[in-house]
């Protein structure tokens, strides 16, 4: 139980700092990758949805 509480506290303390990374811009040499970088945070959601599509295809065995 203490581990869960400590993980929640660590997450809450890191939230203000994680938003800093979203405000940064890529260096000019990597500016052509901006569209890919914008989509990257959504990629894990595609895997999550793929699991449901896969289960629906096998009739939720």
Curated annotation (Swiss-Prot):
Family in the record: Belongs to the PsbK family.
Biological role: One of the components of the core complex of photosystem II (PSII). PSII is a light-driven water:plastoquinone oxidoreductase that uses light energy to abstract electrons from H(2)O, generating O(2) and a proton gradient subsequently used for ATP formation. It consists of a core antenna complex that captures photons, and an electron transfer chain that converts photonic excitation into a charge separation.
Keyword Membrane recorded: yes
Subunit structure and binding partners: PSII is composed of 1 copy each of membrane proteins PsbA, PsbB, PsbC, PsbD, PsbE, PsbF, PsbH, PsbI, PsbJ, PsbK, PsbL, PsbM, PsbT, PsbX, PsbY, PsbZ, Psb30/Ycf12, at least 3 peripheral proteins of the oxygen-evolving complex and a large number of cofactors. It forms dimeric complexes.
Protein name: Photosystem II reaction center protein K
InterPro entries noted in UniProt: PSII_PsbK (IPR003687), PSII_PsbK_sf (IPR037270)
UniProt-listed Pfam families: PsbK
The species this protein was found in: Lotus japonicus
Membrane-spanning intervals of the chain: 36-56
Membrane topology: Single-pass membrane protein
Keywords: Chloroplast, Membrane, Photosynthesis, Photosystem II, Plastid, Reaction center, Thylakoid, Transmembrane, Transmembrane helix
GO biological process: photosynthesis
Entries under SUPFAM superfamilies matching the protein: Photosystem II reaction center protein K, PsbK
Record keyword RNA-binding present: no
Pro-sequence residue ranges: 1-24
This protein's GO CC annotations: chloroplast thylakoid membrane; photosystem II reaction center
Location of this chain's protein in the cell: Plastid, Chloroplast thylakoid membrane
Domain of life: Eukaryota
């Amino acid at each position: 139980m203490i581990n869960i509480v400590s993980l929640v506290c660590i997450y809450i303390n890191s939230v203000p700092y994680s938003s800093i990374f979203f405000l940064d811009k890529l260096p000019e040499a990597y500016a052509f990758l901006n569209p890919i970088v914008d989509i990257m945070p959504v990629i894990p959601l595609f895997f999550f949805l793929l699991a449901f599509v896969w289960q629906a295809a096998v009739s939720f065995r």
